[in-house]
């Protein structure tokens, strides 16, 4: 039996109907139903793209001989010290 008997559930249902009203509960039920329907549709749509064949890869064009592809870039620069003003709250 547990803590909540069927009589308790009926009393709770009556209180909920009195507090929220049947119109609001109907709208809530409709919204929940549409949400579940949309979720199922989204789950079904996620499966469809996996079934489609992958597009054929394009043939790679050879790189020009004059420009190497993976050469590291080195930047020659020198750091300069910046004098920042002293904040009043740190003194």
UniProtKB/Swiss-Prot annotation:
One of its GO terms (molecular function) is protein transmembrane transporter activity. Its main location: membrane. The keyword Cytoplasm does not apply. Residues 78-91 have a biased composition (Basic and acidic residues). It comes from the Bacteria. Keywords: Cell inner membrane, Cell membrane, Membrane, Protein transport, Translocation, Transmembrane, Transmembrane helix, Transport. The keyword Kinase does not apply. GO terms for biological process: protein transport by the Tat complex. The chain crosses the membrane at residues 1-21. It is found in: Cell inner membrane. Part of the twin-arginine translocation (Tat) system that transports large folded proteins containing a characteristic twin-arginine motif in their signal peptide across membranes. TatA could form the protein-conducting channel of the Tat system. The Tat system comprises two distinct complexes: a TatABC complex, containing multiple copies of TatA, TatB and TatC subunits, and a separate TatA complex, containing only TatA subunits. Substrates initially bind to the TatABC complex, which probably triggers association of the separate TatA complex to form the active translocon. Belongs to the TatA/E family. This is Sec-independent protein translocase protein TatA. It comes from Pseudomonas syringae pv. tomato (strain ATCC BAA-871 / DC3000).
């Amino acid at each position: 039996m547990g803590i909540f008997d069927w009589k308790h559930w009926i009393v709770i249902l009556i209180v909920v109907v009195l507090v929220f009203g049947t119109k609001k509960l109907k709208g809530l039920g409709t919204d929940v139903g549409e949400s579940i329907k949309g979720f199922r549709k989204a789950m079904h749509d996620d499966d469809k793209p996996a079934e489609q064949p992958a597009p054929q890869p394009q043939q790679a064009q050879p790189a020009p001989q004059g420009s190497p592809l993976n050469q590291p870039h080195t930047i020659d620069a020198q750091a300069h010290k910046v004098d920042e003003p002293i904040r009043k709250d740190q003194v």
